[in-house]
């Protein structure tokens, strides 16, 4: 889904169109989930944050400026809530339980292989490029790093994933 479509849906949501909100959710949920998961690495927590992201979108839609990058706005909300969740974990010393859950997750899906094989930064770059359609330049701006660095990390990540998938097939 391109940025204009997301912007149009957010504008409709601001006008009170609930059907537009449902379409927005359906079209953006996969990428948003993967983005949040890249921070939390726990399905249950990611699902909780996902609910909060879309609730926050609904409640704060009046703060969205029509004609801007709606995808970036959604991802910024997702990032903020994911980071809030991480800080809660630190306060509760939840780290050991998270490690246990992460070990229990099987490596059957692409997302799990990505999470296992790639660093957090590489995972975000691949997710933002493949699932969200961001250009390397845009990812560089979001992550405060040069476009060339994003491009080389992306290529290296894809090479790692190809190798991991070959090994998984054997």
Q: Where does each model-flagged region fall?
A:
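DNA-recognition helix of helix-turn-helix
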Residues: 10, 83, 131, 137, ...
């Amino acid at each position: 889904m391109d940025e204009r479509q997301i912007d149009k849906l957010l504008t409709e949501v601001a006008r009170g169109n609930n059907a537009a909100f449902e379409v927005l959710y359906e079209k953006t949920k996969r990428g948003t989930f993967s983005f949040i998961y890249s921070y939390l690495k726990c399905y249950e927590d990611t699902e909780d944050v996902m609910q909060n992201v879309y609730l926050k979108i609904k409640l704060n839609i009046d703060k969205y400026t029509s004609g801007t990058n709606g995808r970036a706005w959604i991802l910024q909300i997702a990032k903020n809530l994911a980071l809030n969740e991480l800080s809660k974990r630190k306060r509760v010393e939840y780290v050991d339980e998270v490690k246990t859950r992460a070990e229990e997750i099987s490596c059957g899906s692409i997302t799990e292989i990505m999470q296992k094989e790639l660093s957090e930064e590489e995972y975000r770059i691949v997710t933002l490029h493949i699932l969200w359609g961001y250009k390397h330049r845009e990812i560089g701006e979001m992550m405060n790093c040069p476009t060339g660095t994003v491009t080389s990390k992306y290529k290296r990540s894809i090479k790692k994933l190809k190798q991991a998938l070959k090994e998984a097939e054997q």
